[in-house]
């Protein structure tokens, strides 16, 4: 069940930071289509001026390592939607600024170390009346909502297992590719008896039916391994995805080389292989399936699937702006929050093109 929202008397506009990035620009364009008027922000003055001029929006130039400029950028806004990753490096200065200014913090991160760091500031955020809600994109809104939906169907659940599959020519946005590289050194994580810990088995696989027959999925660390525990209280959580054969082979190699991945220069070499993001045409040809199952260890089971658009841009933009619109209406809850904790399991169903089925 969603937490009771508390009204806000703050301004009804928001800062879109990282607006000239791949996802940030898509976010800005969709804002205009919806009639929203964010203040665009980032560190690239020329790119910001060009985009804001084209879209008819205000802009503010500030780098994350310039605290005074960042504070000035937050004047007169009620929230920040932070779209400039990797958030392992960019989240903290923006969270600091939001807490100083009393401004609500949203981001589209998927990095569990970010979630841990933000959650650790829960008491500070509550004291200042600020909502801290990372992960308002595809990671983790659809899965967070599905997890809460399944817990509602089986309140006795003690195990949550989730998986997702992308079908079509769409690839990962450049920022997501860089984030994946940064997370390689952390290894796979699972939730066991409430504890957030390293997975004991390498490259664990299982079979999942996303709606057209069983396929093999491989365990990975998705954001819900951290966040779904807060949203549902379920103590055991695993997540999986469909990986092409080449990707599985690459992950096997990366596990062997994991100690080297802690070195910045090694990750810098890997970042040279980051590819351009998928075009609008390729995204339009791509769909995403999400599967979830809960069990209670004594025979109880509930499962469901979500079907929606391309995940990295289209579904991310839809989810993030669904949250932004609610924040601008004053529907906020101070402290560290997950999307479904505040807005409930039906939040994802407000995104165009999303369907859900019980299985």
For the regions a language model picked out, list residue spans one by one.
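Conserved beta-strand positions in the Rossmann-like core of class I SAM-dependent methyltransferases
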Residues: 39-40, 106
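N-terminal Rossmann-fold cofactor-binding loop
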Residues: 41-45, 63-64
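Short, conserved SAM-binding/catalytic segment
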Residues: 50-57
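Conserved Rossmann-fold cofactor-binding substructure of NAD(P)-dependent oxidoreductases
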Residues: 61-77, 83-89
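Glycine-/Pro-rich loop/turn segments that contact NAD(P) or position catalytic residues
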Residues: 87-187, 227
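C-terminal helical cap and adjacent loop that interface with cofactors, partners, or active-site loops
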Residues: 279-359
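Active-site-lining helix/loop region of Rossmann-like oxidoreductase modules
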Residues: 17, 152-296, 300-303, 314, ...
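N-terminal Rossmann NAD(P)H-binding glycine-rich loop of SDR-like oxidoreductase domains
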Residues: 14-34
